[in-house]
Amino acid sequence: MTAILERRESTSLWGRFCNWITSTENRLYIGWFGVLMIPTLLTATSVFIIAFIAAPPVDIDGIREPVSGSLLYGNNIISGAIIPTSAAIGLHFYPIWEAASVDEWLYNGGPYELIVLHFLLGVACYMGREWELSFRLGMRPWIAVAYSAPVAAATAVFLIYPIGQGSFSDGMPLGISGTFNFMIVFQAEHNILMHPFHMLGVAGVFGGSLFSAMHGSLVTSSLIRETTENESANEGYKFGQEEETYNIVAAHGYFGRLIFQYASFNNSRSLHFLLAAWPVVGIWFTALGISTMAFNLNGFNFNQSVVDSQGRVINTWADIINRANLGMEVMHERNAHNFPLDLAAVEAPSTNG
């Protein structure tokens, strides 16, 4: 009998680190994208928590009228927010070392830019990490593709829109009421409700919710019975069992009779493709809509489009929305300008004398 002894090659520290980073045996997969994701998301989360609790007021409009957003300065969970970086900073990269002092950095809303840029980098890396893990497990890449929809939406709101408007002060505040304020002002300035891409996004989100509820309820209801008629069907199953617990043919038959035959799927892959693609495509369109409106390619304007034979305007719903938009535009940034931009753009009549 011949024994062959091979000398085991010693792996370098870097090699062991690489193997650990890319190992799919870890409880949580790290991956090369995770190397960047972990510090960026930890930074964004830490600064968000600290700033939400204790950040001083921020001069958001650049007119020396600071706005308070933190809990220690009089806000609650609903009204609190990370106030966007000052209009005085605009789109300038504004790290701590660019300010004369930390107080100046806080006054100009530096934490907002820090949080947003780290957050966007972190979620982009999370998407890459999803692809990386799928690749190493021999899976297809569609999980990362689906996640690209919320990543695109966040990027549109926090980065593309401020770029188009010329200042990070136009970005969405990081808080509950700040989000609603952003939505109201966005409608006032861009008429987003009349934008086709927003309509597609609404159809995607609401339709996706409906399809998800229908699918979950059908799967839960169409069980493969393992018990007699005198026992509960639930008694025939154990939570987490490997055996299939529902019958897609039964679900197909039920739904086909409930609506019509071709409204239901008898192919599981086709069904789940629709469940994934519908909301993802809708949110893609919403992100695209935000990105186009960032550069003032706004929603449809049908103001005063219906007139009678005498030329008098017959108000439509579009005119009602327009008046609401003007009212909302008047209310926001009330000390930064005296009139809505739509009215301020009109030339004043010339006077002789």
From Swiss-Prot:
Q: Where does Fe cation bind?
A: H215, H272
What terms describe the molecular function in GO for this protein?
chlorophyll binding; electron transporter, transferring electrons within the cyclic electron transport pathway of photosynthesis activity; iron ion binding; oxidoreductase activity, acting on diphenols and related substances as donors, oxygen as acceptor; oxygen evolving activity
Where is the protein localized?
Plastid, Chloroplast thylakoid membrane
**Where chlorophyll a ChlzD1 is bound, by residue?**
H118
Electron transport in keyword set: yes
Site positions per UniProt: Stabilizes free radical intermediate: H190
Q: Where does chlorophyll a PD1 bind?
A: H198
**Description of post-translational modifications:** Tyr-161 forms a radical intermediate that is referred to as redox-active TyrZ, YZ or Y-Z. C-terminally processed by CTPA; processing is essential to allow assembly of the oxygen-evolving complex and thus photosynthetic growth.
**Where, per the database record, does this protein carry N-acetylthreonine?**
T2
Q: Which InterPro entries match?
A: D1/D2, Photo_II_D1/D2_sf, Photo_RC_L/M, Photo_RC_L/M_CS, PSII_D1
Q: Where is this site: Tyrosine radical intermediate?
A: Y161
Spell out which residues are annotated as carrying Phosphothreonine: T2
Note the pro-peptide positions: 345-353
Catalysed reaction, written as an equation: 2 a plastoquinone + 4 hnu + 2 H2O = 2 a plastoquinol + O2
Annotated site residues (Cleavage) in this chain: A344, A345
Q: How does it sit in the membrane?
A: Multi-pass membrane protein
Note whether Nucleus occurs among the keywords: no
Keywords (A to Z) from UniProt: Acetylation, Calcium, Chlorophyll, Chloroplast, Chromophore, Electron transport, Herbicide resistance, Iron, Magnesium, Manganese, Membrane, Metal-binding, Oxidoreductase, Phosphoprotein, Photosynthesis, Photosystem II, Plastid, Thylakoid, Transmembrane, Transmembrane helix, Transport
Q: How is the cofactor bound?
A: The D1/D2 heterodimer binds P680, chlorophylls that are the primary electron donor of PSII, and subsequent electron acceptors. It shares a non-heme iron and each subunit binds pheophytin, quinone, additional chlorophylls, carotenoids and lipids. D1 provides most of the ligands for the Mn4-Ca-O5 cluster of the oxygen-evolving complex (OEC). There is also a Cl(-1) ion associated with D1 and D2, which is required for oxygen evolution. The PSII complex binds additional chlorophylls, carotenoids and specific lipids.
Q: What are the transmembrane regions?
A: 29-46, 118-133, 142-156, 197-218, 274-288
| Binding-site residues, pheophytin a | Y126
What function does this protein fulfil? Answer: Photosystem II (PSII) is a light-driven water:plastoquinone oxidoreductase that uses light energy to abstract electrons from H(2)O, generating O(2) and a proton gradient subsequently used for ATP formation. It consists of a core antenna complex that captures photons, and an electron transfer chain that converts photonic excitation into a charge separation. The D1/D2 (PsbA/PsbD) reaction center heterodimer binds P680, the primary electron donor of PSII as well as several subsequent electron acceptors.
**Belongs to which family?**
Belongs to the reaction center PufL/M/PsbA/D family.
Q: What name does the UniProt record give this protein?
A: Photosystem II protein D1
